[in-house]
Amino acid sequence: MINRIKISQVIVAEGRDDTTNLKRYFDVETYETRWSAINDQDIERIQRLHELHGVIVFTDPDFNDERIRRMIITVIPTVQHVFLKRDEAVPKSKTKGRSLGIEHASYEDLKTALAQVTEQFKNENEFDISRSDLIRLGFLAGADSRKRREYLGEQLRIGYSNGKQLLKRLELFGVTLAEVKEAMTKYSI
C-alpha cells in the first residue's frame, strides 16, 4: 500500500479523471477546470483558493492545458507549477485512447513531478539568457530546434514552449544559462 503524501496546496487540474488519479496516491484537494472551459468565475475561485491555501497548477502537457496555465498566470502570477513530461502522461493501455493526461501518470511520475514544484521568477534583473543565446544553442533555428525545446522543457520540467515563448518561459521560472547548458549536455538527435 502506498503511503499517501499530504499536499497542503490546492491543485488545479483539468478534470475528474486527473483528480481521481491524484487522490489515489496523495492526500490532496483539487479544483477542476473542466477541460479548457475555464472562465472568469473559475479564475476568481482559483484566486481565492490561492489566497487561502496556495495553488499548484498541474495540467496535462498539451496545448489546451498550456492555454489554461497562461490564463491563470496572467491573473495570479504567484501560483506554483508542476509539469509532467509527455511520455509520463501517455496512456499505458491502447484502450485508454491517445490523449495525454495526469490520469495516465504512475505514482512515481506524479511524485517526481510534485517534488519539483516551481514558482515564477521574481527578480528579472538576474535573468541572464538572451535571444541570441537561444539562437546560438539551436533552440530558435535549425532542423531540430523543436526537439531541442521539447527536450529542454522536459529536463527542466517547465513544459514545452514554442520558439516565440521559450525566452519568456525561461525567464518566468528563473532558469539560468548554466542550467540550460547543463540540461542539454545529454541531448542527442
UniProtKB/Swiss-Prot annotation:
Enzyme category, top tier: hydrolase
CDD domains, A to Z: TOPRIM_RNase_M5_like
Catalytic reaction list: Endonucleolytic cleavage of RNA, removing 21 and 42 nucleotides, respectively, from the 5'- and 3'-termini of a 5S-rRNA precursor
GO molecular function: metal ion binding; ribonuclease M5 activity; rRNA binding
Binding residues for Mg(2+) 2: 60, 62
One Gene Ontology cellular component annotation held by this UniProt entry: cytoplasm
Residues the record lists as binding Mg(2+) 1: 14, 60
EC id: 3.1.26.8
InterPro entries the UniProt entry points to: RNase_M5, RNase_M5_C, TOPRIM_dom, TOPRIM_RNase_M5-like
Cofactor(s), by name: Mg(2+)
Stored Pfam families: DUF4093
GO BP terms, alphabetized: rRNA processing
Keywords: Cytoplasm, Endonuclease, Hydrolase, Magnesium, Metal-binding, Nuclease, Ribosome biogenesis, RNA-binding, rRNA processing, rRNA-binding
Ranges of residues in domain Toprim: 8-91
Highest taxon, organism lineage: Bacteria
Subcellular location(s) per record: Cytoplasm
CC cofactor note: Binds two Mg(2+) per subunit.
Function of the protein: Required for correct processing of both the 5' and 3' ends of 5S rRNA precursor. Cleaves both sides of a double-stranded region yielding mature 5S rRNA in one step.
Similarity-based family: Belongs to the ribonuclease M5 family.
Cross-referenced HAMAP family: RNase_M5
Protein name: Ribonuclease M5 2
Organism of this sequence: Ligilactobacillus salivarius (strain UCC118)
